[in-house]
């Protein structure tokens, strides 16, 4: 074969680059985030990335893709399950369709404080759910983000009672437990993909939604929502998952780094919530949002859900005994 001068120069350049390249180069993983930068998912992801780079002496790096750039949250579970995506941080309710027992953590009014959320996820309950997601979905939970209680927001009016809720069109995730909660409260919610939610609120397709204060702030929902009802029906927990196939392909050292970084990032996320939620709540008020407390300590909301919704999902979470034992572990 005869090489022209230009081809010879190009080939020489490639050889030079190959010779100059280090013997080992950093391994780069992709991490999907459903939320915008600045929220709980971003904080967990960036801390995990920093820790991984430190623990592996720079041999592992992570690229973060916020705002659903790599697909909606349920897509990321599916893609991780088949080895097309490395990591994802997502709302726990979007793991439930793939591993139903995880729905335990979204049973309305089960978790009543950040401390209880931490106790469940980092104790025996969390350990069992990790095993279940590996078995059911081929993804491994290696960390947890804590976002706080999902509060109700809307653009129409203050909501104190279930009567006030009637007539509002509320967006919910495509999650049977959450849909059933609103049905028990007397309305038919509108399931909508997370990536469509801001636009749906902006255009008036839906009147409201529910999410933690931190998420409301990060997604700038204050620009399209006026009223907040401080309900506490679900404590938002967002697991950090890794593809089990990809995890098993790694060396023992990298596996240990992933697990260790996940634990440390989890604790960081918990402290981030405790230190930032009140500040963020005040900032939302300063930006014009109005916070209303539900009437009578939320008793009507709680009664409807625990009587009508809990029994419907006993089987999927592992039985009524599973829920009873979880409540006992929390001292209730």
State the predicted function of each range.
Residues 1-11:
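Bacterial N-terminal signal peptides that target proteins for export
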Residues 19-26:
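Sec/Tat signal peptide C-region and signal peptidase I cleavage site
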Residues 27-116, 125, 129-332:
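N-terminal secretory/targeting leader peptides
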């Amino acid at each position: 074969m005869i090489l022209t001068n230009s081809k010879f120069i190009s080939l020489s350049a490639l050889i030079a680059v190959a010779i100059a390249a280090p013997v080992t180069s950093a391994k780069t993983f992709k991490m999907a985030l459903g939320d915008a930068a600045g929220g709980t998912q971003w904080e967990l992801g960036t801390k995990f990335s920093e820790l991984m780079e430190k623990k592996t002496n720079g041999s592992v790096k992570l690229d973060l893709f916020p705002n659903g750039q790599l697909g909606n949250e349920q897509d990321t579970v599916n893609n991780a399950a088949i080895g097309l995506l490395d990591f994802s941080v997502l709302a726990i309710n979007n793991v439930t369709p793939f591993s139903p027992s995880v729905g335990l953590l979204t049973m309305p009014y089960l978790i009543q404080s950040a401390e209880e959320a931490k106790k469940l996820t980092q104790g025996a309950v969390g350990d069992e759910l990790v095993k279940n997601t590996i078995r059911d979905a081929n993804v491994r939970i290696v960390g947890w983000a804590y976002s706080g209680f999902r509060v109700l927001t809307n653009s129409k009016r203050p909501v104190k009672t279930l009567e006030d809720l009637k007539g509002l069109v509320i967006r919910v995730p495509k999650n049977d437990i959450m849909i059933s909660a609103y049905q028990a409260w007397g309305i038919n919610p509108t399931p909508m993909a997370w990536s469509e939610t801001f636009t749906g609120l902006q255009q008036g397709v839906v009147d409201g939604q529910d999410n933690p204060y931190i998420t409301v702030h990060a997604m700038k929902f204050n620009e399209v929502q006026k009223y907040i009802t401080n309900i506490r029906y679900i404590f938002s927990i967002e697991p950090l998952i890794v593809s089990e196939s990809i995890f098993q392909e790694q060396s023992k050292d990298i596996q240990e780094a992933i697990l260790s970084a996940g634990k440390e990032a989890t604790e960081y996320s918990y402290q981030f919530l405790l230190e930032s939620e009140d500040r963020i709540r005040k900032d939302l008020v300063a930006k014009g949002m109005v916070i209303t407390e539900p009437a009578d300590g939320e008793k009507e909301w709680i009664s409807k859900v625990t009587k009508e919704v809990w029994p419907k999902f006993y089987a999927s979470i592992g039985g009524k005994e599973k829920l009873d034992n979880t409540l006992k572990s929390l001292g209730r």
